[in-house]
Amino acid sequence: MEAINLTILVIGVLFLISIVATLISSRIGAPILLVFLIIGMLAGEQGLGGITFNNPQVAFLIGSIALVIILFDGGMRTHPERFRVALAPAAMLATLGVVVTCTVTGLAAAWILGLHWLQGLLLGAILSSTDAAAVFSIFQSRGIRIKDRVASTLEIESGSNDPMAVMLTITLVGVLAEYTALDWSVLIVFLKQAIIGGAVGYGAGRLFVFLCRKLPLSFAFFPLMAVACCISVYAVTTQFEGSGFLAVYLMGYFVGNARLPQVLYILRVHDGLAWLSQIVMFLMLGLLVVPSQLLDHLLPALAIAGVLIFIARPLAVLLSLIPFHFPAKDQLFISWVGLRGAVPIILALFPWLAGVPDEHLYFNVAFVIVIVSLVFQGWSISPVARWLKLEVPKESGPDQTMPLDAIASNEVIEVVSFTLKGDSPMLDKQWQDFTVPHSAEFLGVIRDGEWLLSRDNPVFKLKDSVLVLCKMADVPDISTVLASAASSRTMTASDFFGDFVLNAQITLDELDAFYSITLPEHESHVTLADYITERFHRRVVVGDQVKLDALVLTVRQLDDHGNVKLVGIKPSDS
C-alpha cells in the first residue's frame, strides 16, 4: 500500500512540476515539450528522482494513446480554409517528402555510423516524420500567427505524414528481422493504409456528428464520448491495416468543423486533455531514456541531425513543393520547422519491440536528434518567422466567450465580452454608434462589478466589459468592430497592412489616380484582386504582399471562396 501511495505522490509531483515549469518555459522562450522531456530525464534512473522505467511495451501503449488524443485535438482545430490552401502541398510533403527525408538521412546515417544501408534507412524512416504534437504545441505556446499558407501546410503535413513513416519503419523492421521483403508491395501497403485511414476517418467523423445530434446526453459526456470514439477509431483502423493516426486526425477535422453546440464544449475539454497527453508522453519518454547511453553515440547523432536539418529536410521541401510555386521565404521556413518530437522516439520503439539488432542504437540516436530539433528549431521559430516576414497580426477577438450550450438552436449562440482598453474604438461612445451584424444584441456593460442595462444606453468607459449576444459565426465581424488591439502583439494591423484599406475590385488605373504610380504594361485595367492572385498562382492567403512601384499591397481579407476582398496599402520601404 505504501508503494502505491508513493507512486501516486510521484506522479502528482511530476505533473505539478511540469505545469509550473511552463511558466519558466514561456519566460525564457524554451519549447514546452523540451521542458517536459528534461523533467522526465531528471526524474529517471540516472537523474535526481532515480525512477527506473524500461518497459517499451508500456511506453508504446501510452505514447500511442497520447498521440491519438493530440491528433484528434489538432484535427478539430483545423479550419476548412486551411485544406483549401494547403492540402495538396501538405500531401506531397507527407509522401514524397517523407521518402526523400528517409533516403537522404538514412544513407548519411549508414555512412556516419558504419551501418548496413538497410539499418541506415530504418533510422532514416524513424526520423522522417515531423511531429504533430511538436508543431501544434509550438504554434499555440508561441502565440504567433504565421501566414496561413505556411502554417496550414506544416500542420496538415504533421498530422498526415505518420502513415508513410510508420509504413517505412514497419517494412524495414520486418526486413531486418527477416520476416518480410523489400519490394514494390511497400507502395501497395502505403496506399492501403492511406485509403483505409481516410475512409474510416471520414465515416467516423460523420457518425460522431450524427450521434451528437441524436443522443440526449448531458453536455458533460460528449468530450468523454469523443475520447472513447477516437481511441476506438484508431484501434479499429489499425486492426484493418489502415493508418489509425490519419483516421483520428480526419475524424477530428469533421467533428471540429460541424455546426454543433457540443463542439465548443468538446474543444474546451480536449485542450486540457491534449496538454495532459503531451505532459504524460514526454515525461514517460524522458524516464525511458538512459542519459549515459546517449553519450555513446552523441557525436554521430549530432552529425545526423545536421544532415537532417540542413540537407534532407530542405531537399524534401524543395522537391515536394515544385508544382505549387511557393515563395522562397515560405519554403525556407517550412524547411526550418520540420520539427521532430515524440513520433520519432515512439517509432524507435518498433526495432526494440521486434528484437532487431542494435535496437538501443535507434532509440538513443532518435532521442538526441529530437532534443537537437526542439532546442535549435523549436526555440527559433518566432525570430525566424519575423526575419522572413511571415508573421501576420493576430485576428481580433473577444476577451471572454460563453457559449449557450443548452439552448436548442440550429446555430451556436454565444455571449461574448469585450474589455475596453486605452486603444479601444468604443471609448466614450454608445452601442448605436457602431455598425454590427443585425443579429447581435447588446446586453449591457459590467462597470465596477455593476451591470448597466442596455436600455439605459450607457457611454462606454475604460475597463468596461461590454456584453453582446450573437451567433458564433458573427463573432469575427463583431470583433473587427469592437475588439481592442492586444497589448502582447508583436505588430499592429496598421504596421503590417498599412493605414488604408481598399476594395480589391478597384483597378490599377483607379489606384494610379490617387497615388501616381508607374503601372505594368497592359495591366492598367486589372483589379487589385487579380493582380495579386496571379502573382501567387491563385493560392492567396492573408498577409501576402506584392510590391507595385512605390507601394506595397497586402492581402487583408478573403471572402468565403478564398478570393481577395480587402487590400491594405502602404509605402514601400525601398
From Swiss-Prot:
Pfam families: CorC_HlyC (PF03471), Na_H_Exchanger (PF00999). Residues 402-484 form the RCK C-terminal domain. The chain crosses the membrane at residues 4-24, 28-48, 56-76, 85-105, 117-139, 170-190, 191-211, 216-236, 244-264, 272-292, 302-322, 332-352, 361-381. Keywords: Antiport, Cell inner membrane, Cell membrane, Ion transport, Membrane, Potassium, Potassium transport, Transmembrane, Transmembrane helix, Transport. Optimum pH is 7.5. Exhibits K(+)/H(+) antiporter activity between pH 7.5 and 9.5. The keyword Cell inner membrane applies. SUPFAM superfamilies: FAD-binding/transporter-associated domain-like. GO terms for biological process: potassium ion transport; proton transmembrane transport. K(+)/H(+) antiporter that extrudes potassium in exchange for external protons. Can also catalyze NH(4)(+)/H(+) antiport. Could have weak activity with Na(+). This is K(+)/H(+) antiporter NhaP. It comes from Alkalimonas amylolytica. The lineage of its organism: Bacteria, Pseudomonadati, Pseudomonadota, Gammaproteobacteria, Alkalimonas.
